[in-house]
Amino acid sequence: MEKKFLKVGNNINFKFNTDGLEYDLIPGIVYNIIVDRYTDTVSLQESGKLPLPSKVYCTSRDERFIDKVINSYNLSESGFTGVMLAGLKGSGKTVMAKMIANKSGLPIVNIDKNIRPHILRNIVEMLGDTSVCFLFDELDKVLADYDDSFLLQVLDGSDTKGKHMILFTCNDDSEISEYLIDRCSRIRYWREFEEMSPSLIMEVLNDKLNDKKEVKSLTDFIKDNFEVCSFDNIVSFVKEANNYPTTTFEELFEDMNLSSKGTIKPHARSCKENNHKNVKNKLASDDYCWTVC
């Protein structure tokens, strides 16, 4: 099969001329789209592999969903297998998108907010029968300035010779075009991300909390007080708890960029009572100094 790309340094160009080395896109490698702002000429630039945390927290339901997406793509004959991962910010949507992209075994093309939809359509045309996984993070942030008619054309597959996967994430699905919702031919799978379950919270705490005796107490504190139980918020709070082992959960919470469900419900830490007294005495002194100053 004739190669469709040329590599010059780190840039991978569509084969419009004979300069450079012939090149095939590499499975698992991320390519950023480079667009000449004067000519709209498109090239791709290698960007390594998608970074993932050393440990990914994944439920059996998550694993079944990922396997289903991959299997459906493999069974498809042409066009796009579209996936929308929507919902709570900081809940792991981007991590799951990266996991799916890596598991697809396809070259990964990153679409950022600067790539206009007509450019995406042109890329799909130029790819021909070369299959890739497109990754479009936080789609909802760009749709206000985005002509989604081109995106709809792309997802309809009218210009597609090969078969592709396209992964979207969004925090606010109310911003998504009505022409994408309940249209499985365009977006086959739609997964809503909500708060972490108590069992998953406890698993994270068992891994990351230094004082394992506090796992149950901190799990209860999170369930009772966190307005947004996202992975991002929980991991950040655990770091604070590890860094300040004699500070109450309530004080840690009050000082962080976290919203509460209402009046904070205290839960005891496992540190010694005299440590609590020392902290309270220090806080009283600090508060007095702050007031006087």
Question: What are these model-derived regions, one by one?
Answer:
Residues Q45-V83:
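Pre-Walker A (pre-P-loop) alpha-helix and adjacent loop at the N terminus of AAA/AAA+ ATPase modules
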Residues S76-A97:
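Walker A/P-loop nucleotide-binding motif
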Residues I115-R116, D140-K141, N171-I176, E195-I201:
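Conserved nucleotide-binding/hydrolysis micro-motifs of P-loop NTPases
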Residues R64, A101-T130, L143-S149:
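Short glycine-rich substrate-engagement loop in P-loop NTPases that contacts/grips substrate
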Residues E22-K55:
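Conserved ASCE P-loop NTPase core motifs with emphasis on AAA+ ATPases
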Residues M1-V30, R183, W190-C293:
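C-terminal alpha-helical "lid" subdomain
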